[in-house]
Amino acid sequence: HSINEEEELMLLKWLYRNIKKNIFIESRTDEDIEKYSDVIELNLSSINPCVSGPKRPQDKINLEDVKKTYLNSLNSEETEILVKSNSNTLSNGKICLAAVTSCTNTSNPSVLIMAGIIAKKAVELGIKIPSWVKTSFAPGSKVVQEYMQRAGLQKFLDKLGFNIVGFGCTTCIGNSGPLDESISKKIEKENLNVCSVISGNRNFEGRIHPLIKSNFLASPPLVIIYALAGRIDIDLLNDEIATINGKKFFMRDLWPSSTEVKAIMDKVLKAELYKKNYKEIFEGDSSWSKINITNSSTFQWSINSTYIKRPPFLEDEKNNEKKIIRA
């Protein structure tokens, strides 16, 4: 029920007393303060944006050190190829896969909205993703799709090439699909050390794609930024990510403020959005509902299927029953 002024005043008094007692330590005695086995002091100004890579998820790299770390990972031959390469052609250090994936984004709308705002600003400025970058967006649920559409941001992600390809595991587990044939051939022919940047949680060599040696884990907004740059050997804090008609654009030109992000979150994130989508979670779309199935408690094997066959060894055992001895 809606509360009246008297009830509201009582609630505010209760909140004030409890907040004062439990949060503001200076107003409490030593006996009131909780004792912990370990106390960690953290200087918030020491926190830096970072990514992980190029081979393991635990290998954290500060954003300002990504370029240096990648260059140090190259052997002498790869370094020579990179030095001789043209910045506008496929070579070592170029990003061939950029994906906003489901595993680390569904419960964090703020970073997805940030990614959408970056895409919007890039489209409005005329910044495009280089041709060698394959892009995709795989939300963890349809809730994400709906609030990105409500925010008017999905259309800008689409224009950059970050179209929704599915819901759930995709590029992060190696389900990216093939690279463009011409790109694959050049990577193999020249033995290039190309990269992927995904917002997943695993980046072991060969896991994302067999032709991609260096893989980096980053937040969704950084995935968009790196895709626009098209290469990993860049200092995003200082180097331009694109030049249009002689004008240089930097990450700071695209990065949204917390105020921008909060304004959109307050507008589109509503409880009913989640209730509606999870209520319909087992219904599926029209393609799912059109599938003809037999009403049975066990799987109905099809003799015409070339994909799933009934294991023959189960039938063999059924026809050759043996007694169990000394079990």
Where are the language model's segments positioned?
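Fe-S-dependent hydro-lyases/dehydratases of central metabolism
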Residues: H1-A327
